[in-house]
């Protein structure tokens, strides 16, 4: 399976820097990168999607066409920008924005019906990991119960919460074991990405694991040169 690199800007990128980054990345890449390189700016960092060398996605959207949902963007906003790729289930939205499993199920179903490409994020907390691998498997299995694992436009990103933003990536053995388990659950055509303190130093090694189909990258992608280096490892 072709390896993938995704950049999640979170809410860290200044608006005009984000715009400049997207335009410069478009100049750097080639058409064959379109299905292999994804960028998720925040809402103000999005641009009308005329990019041909990478896929532009949104970090979040409310599961309605439009309406009285103060502070949200909806499918109509994204479709107007020609954006049809969406992150769902990121741990920061689960924890900080209190997005429940039932709401994530609703969001997934809505955007599945719109035929969006969905990057669905899962991952366990350190307390679960410390209980042993059986507990991890049960937890991840529960996180996947609410979505259609045979959806053809699905990408799953495994991000252990204890590794996000901590500068402590999961060990290669942990990634190997966890991805091996998840591959048994997922449709064989569904890409499975790893995220969690990925950086220029460890990206190539993680990509070398057969069951890792790509990377979802946070802070290490915020500088374009770093992201370009990681893309070169694909």
UniProtKB/Swiss-Prot annotation:
Enzyme superclass (EC): isomerase
Catalytic activity: D-glyceraldehyde 3-phosphate = dihydroxyacetone phosphate
Keywords: Cytoplasm, Gluconeogenesis, Glycolysis, Isomerase
GO biological process entries: gluconeogenesis; glyceraldehyde-3-phosphate biosynthetic process; glycerol catabolic process; glycolytic process
EC number: 5.3.1.1
PROSITE patterns documented for this protein: TIM_1, TIM_2
Subcellular location: Cytoplasm
Family: Belongs to the triosephosphate isomerase family.
NCBIfam families (UniProt xref): PRK00042.3-2 (NF000728), PRK00042.3-3 (NF000729)
Oligomeric and partner information: Homodimer.
Described function: Involved in the gluconeogenesis. Catalyzes stereospecifically the conversion of dihydroxyacetone phosphate (DHAP) to D-glyceraldehyde-3-phosphate (G3P).
Protein name: Triosephosphate isomerase
Taxonomic placement: Bacteria, Pseudomonadati, Campylobacterota, Epsilonproteobacteria, Campylobacterales
């Amino acid at each position: 399976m072709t390896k993938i690199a995704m950049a999640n800007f979170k809410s860290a990128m200044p608006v005009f820097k984000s715009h400049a980054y997207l335009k410069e990345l478009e100049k750097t890449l080639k058409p064959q990168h379109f299905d292999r390189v994804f960028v998720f700016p925040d809402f103000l960092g999005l641009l009308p999607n005329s990019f041909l060398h990478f896929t532009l996605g949104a970090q979040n959207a409310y599961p309605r066409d439009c309406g009285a949902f103060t502070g949200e963007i909806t499918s109509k906003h994204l479709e107007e920008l020609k954006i049809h790729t969406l992150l769902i289930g990121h741990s920061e939205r689960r924890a900080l924005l209190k997005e429940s499993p039932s709401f994530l199920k609703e969001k997934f179903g809505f955007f599945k019906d719109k035929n969006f490409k969905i990057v669905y994020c899962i991952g366990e907390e350190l307390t679960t990991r410390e209980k042993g691998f059986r507990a991890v498997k049960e937890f991840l299995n529960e996180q996947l119960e609410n979505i259609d694992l045979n959806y053809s436009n699905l990408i799953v990103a495994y991000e252990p919460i204890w590794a996000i933003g901590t500068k402590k990536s999961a060990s290669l053995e942990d990634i190997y074991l966890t991805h091996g388990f998840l591959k048994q659950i997922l449709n064989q055509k569904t890409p499975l990405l790893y995220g969690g303190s990925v950086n220029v130093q460890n990206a190539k090694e993680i990509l070398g694991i057969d069951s890792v189909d790509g990377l979802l990258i946070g802070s290490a992608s915020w500088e374009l040169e770093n992201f370009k280096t990681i893309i070169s490892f694909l």
